[in-house]
């Protein structure tokens, strides 16, 4: 950055406002533009600053169980704050925040919650569900299928990113295209309001129609893609060799595609069931029958294609998996994809059985069309007009079967019957031999069908009069309702007959508040159940309270109605419903009952006072005047009524609570007091109100769990106006530090709020205060994408060479993240470009490790030393080699060609790293692909095509074609590796061909240790990381082998005795480390650098002790528990792990105790096995013959590997 550019930044920072976007972008790196949530997640993961925000977003709505009761406002406010509480409870990672890895995507959360509200609305509105049992069954299996698919998503993405085979790439991408369409369309409709949701489902070329085509075997359908992968003529999904990545990718795509296929079936069933219920609720029998048919047909079709006959998709996939599992070489498979599929085979078989044995809970029989409808002409006749019964109208009837929650389609409508003088006919229906109920529906003229009533299986006669009483009770004309109800009841109408949502005439009367009907007819009948509940557990008192029928509420209470009755699903009382609706008179009538329990809680712990807060202050005042009211009641989430008043920004309600002496400082389960919510929301109105009552509320109130103040929250949530309002207060305390020693200045810097930063500095915030990690504000600013923040801090005296706990300077922070502009600015201001971290890394090392090319170029242009070693004796170019970053390697060699000079230490180290990477590739190939017949030339070409030899080509020193020059050495190395491994497997016999006998014996004797290791611990060999241990044996063998074959020249001696010295039982520690990790799939702390939590340490110690016992038992031949107190072993291991001390010392002490051999004898044994002329060790008993073989696999010190450098580099440079 030139001085002119620096002046531009300084000038921009000096302005009162933040510089405009265009100016800022000139200073920021290209990669610092706006990123999607997924892009930001990937960046944070890549630089090891991932946080829990990303994983929580998708589940956030699930934490807001009280949405239907308390409302959308509370949900949208509390959800993101709950996320922050989770993040900060374990200590905020300030570096993660500085990189925007903790940014709370409020818009995304709001969108998710709005979708959730719409879903809830749809469910609450679903009063009648004819296919409810179908929905339950489908949803349960759908959730399982989707869980499996979601768990497989990451690896399926990996397949898409790494697939190279053109043959299967188009097929796999076809599966992915369908998957993306499926998920995108589902997401598009998920949160729509009910009417739009249905409209999208019914689109002629919409999602349902498109998904039905998934079964079509042609074109770009999912079915055609899966059939291509299953085609036995190609066998794409069956590996030919153990590392046939193409086949494993095809196999994984096949499995994933099958799960998607099943998911489509369940999604279609779920949506068509919803449509069937939608039409049922609307009384649209024609479309209900059509959707009923759709559900049955879809299930039958998909069931057949997935599990039918000998050609079911799932059967075919399982057959392929079983074929692969039976391959002779598959036990050595090193494919993560394959291992996962093996674990999921059982799940696929379970899914197959579920589908195959499932019968949809539908009644296939269709009732007969009604034909016997009689209008009485006796004393029971009911003259017209009454209700819908008017002379001249036509009435038709239809029937539907119902049994245990299962339904049939509607029957055909009967012939029309014309009403003439009489109403309410009697219907005759035959007894159902299958003992199912018959639901009777009626339709006047061409109007909407109505549910008329239920006939039990044994009933043959049904008088159509009960629905008319229910309709009369709902009549808005109360006088007419009384007259009609009187007549209908006299003629036999059943007051308790249930209709919509299982509501009776009593519920209907309560809804309308028709006291006259209730007094004159219903309540005089002592047998009437006034506690009768509808489908959701609402009694007539609930209905009246929610409708604000104050007089009817009083009438019911006077006649003994339970004033504290609770609904079945949410435990709401009538008082909850009345307060939520804001009906103050109804609330007062309820409160007058001597039996009222004013503090009853619903499912989420909210009392009527909580719900009242979300309505009006008059209702709140009525409750507060009750002597038993709990003003400080807390919900399950710890929210008080005052919390809700602040969240709802209702100052009148807040004032009422303050006047009633409510506690204003109670903290919820996330340790948030009301003032913390006000600050987090950025509510200036409520903040000013709370500040105005400082005698009751402290503006410096801290959370109990992490010591955050309101100012911390306002800054973290980027509520600048709220932060400024707090900073106006003379008594604001800027010295309070949160957990992790976080100041408000740290947070302001980490969230990039330059105006707040300036204000804090004006108010005297300590610019050099350090976080728990030792970061100053300048360290954090160096991580931010805005270089002007660093400018402000430095201009205010920030220490440019401040050190963190890891000895990082701000320059290190900027370089590691790749903040090129900030790096340049810091260097211009005198930052030490050669400063080292605790591990000896310079800024250049860190930039290289982070693959930040532009920053590396900047540092090199500013004079960074590219020959500076870190504590591991690595130069920056070595980091690039380890990363396989070819462009970075070339950049360094352009700057200094001597870096590949084999006569220099740095050149030899580079070549050693390259050789080790190549040897690892070869070892993995041969150890896993012994069934393949590729010759050296073909293998060389494969390595070349895969780019595995590019580094070797780059480091070739001679003129001419690097590939052709390096090729002979690679071919010899391949041949050598192949030969030694062949001899290893044979375990005996003399070498043939051009290899001389002594050298081949060395090869065999050296590799025999690895074979012993394999036989003794076979489980380890199956795991990926076991390759590292045998690789060391190969490297030693190669070094001893090459001189005798005259492959290279060297001044050093490579005899076995030069490699072995001071061997004792500690030599087994590396083996034990690998052994333990492979059995537990965990990496243990054998070096004692950090402590481990108690439960983790306990579990780990038990596993280590168990495997250690197995190892010692194998060596001795008798149970180790008979010789050693294993409980004591486990206890000592646990103490070591928990305290962070080396486990190695514990293991070693017991190994010494267990062994009868002293250190000298162990050394003799090891040398014997490596010697070309074995001698007899008389002191060794037969019981210990296995031990040296185990020890020799790991006993050599890692530093001795450095002696391989000379030979390895000569291989590539000759």
Swiss-Prot record:
Pfam family, one: Ank_2
Keyword set includes Transmembrane: yes
GO molecular function: toxin activity
Main localization category: secreted
GO cellular component: extracellular region; host cell presynaptic membrane; membrane; other organism cell membrane
GO terms for biological process, alphabetical: exocytosis
Keyword Cytoplasm included in the entry's annotation: no
Quaternary structure note: Homotetramer in membrane.
Function: Insecticidal presynaptic neurotoxin that induces massive neurotransmitter release at insect (but not vertebrate) neuromuscular junctions. Native toxin forms cation-permeable pores (with high permeability to calcium) in lipid membranes locust muscle membrane and artificial lipid bilayers. May bind to insect neurexin-1 homolog, insect adhesion G protein-coupled receptor L1 homolog, and insect receptor-type tyrosine-protein phosphatase S homolog, and induces neurotransmitter exocytosis both by forming tetrameric pores in membranes and signaling via G protein-coupled receptor.
Similarity section: Belongs to the cationic peptide 01 (latrotoxin) family. 04 (delta-latroinsectotoxin) subfamily.
Name of the protein: Delta-latroinsectotoxin-Lt1a
